[in-house]
């Protein structure tokens, strides 16, 4: 996760900036959707969550060999969240490694790894059925080939960096 931390901080200037958010930037349409939170009746609109802020979007799976990366992602969220970086995990079973129930996935994320950043309920991240967020991201960068692919988006919603599963 060190490479990710350094790249995010340097690319976005977060390390020296007390708070990074450009509220004047219009939220891109692909983020303007109500998405179900993991194991919750609540939804989140990414425009409300991240308008004008850089965002790290990650496809996750609770039974993947890379699941330990939740610790590093949480550290990134804790370290740079107050400065404006928004971390969002999209649980997905596209690679057949997500828990059978949302309750189990939530236990792994929230209890086992202490995740406090926003987690979206299991949804497709590849192919024709990908969520609007990932459909757009996949047009800008390579679609995820595996779980825990990370995309760093600037405040305008543009992908500025893609990190493969092994970056952690």
Stretches found by the model and what they are:
Residues 26-43, 66, 128:
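Rossmann-fold NAD(P)H-dependent dehydrogenase/reductase core
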Residues 66-130:
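Structural microenvironment flanking redox-active thiols in thiol-disulfide oxidoreductases
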């Amino acid at each position: 996760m060190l490479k990710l931390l350094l790249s995010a901080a340097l690319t976005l200037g977060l390390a020296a900036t007390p708070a990074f958010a450009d509220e004047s930037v219009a939220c891109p349409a692909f983020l303007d959707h109500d998405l179900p939170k993991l194991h919750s009746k609540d939804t989140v609109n990414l425009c409300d969550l991240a308008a004008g802020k850089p965002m790290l979007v990650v496809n996750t799976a609770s039974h993947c060999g890379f699941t330990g990366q939740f610790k590093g992602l949480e550290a990134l969220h804790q370290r740079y969240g107050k400065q404006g970086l928004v971390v969002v995990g999209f649980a997905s079973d596209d690679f057949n490694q997500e828990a059978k129930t949302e309750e189990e996935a939530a236990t792994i994320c929230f209890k086992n790894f202490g995740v406090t950043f926003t987690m979206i309920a299991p949804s497709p991240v590849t192919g024709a059925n990908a969520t609007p967020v990932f459909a757009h991201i996949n047009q800008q960068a390579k679609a995820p080939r595996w779980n825990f692919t990370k995309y760093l988006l600037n405040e305008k919603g543009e992908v500025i960096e893609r990190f493969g599963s092994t970056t952690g």
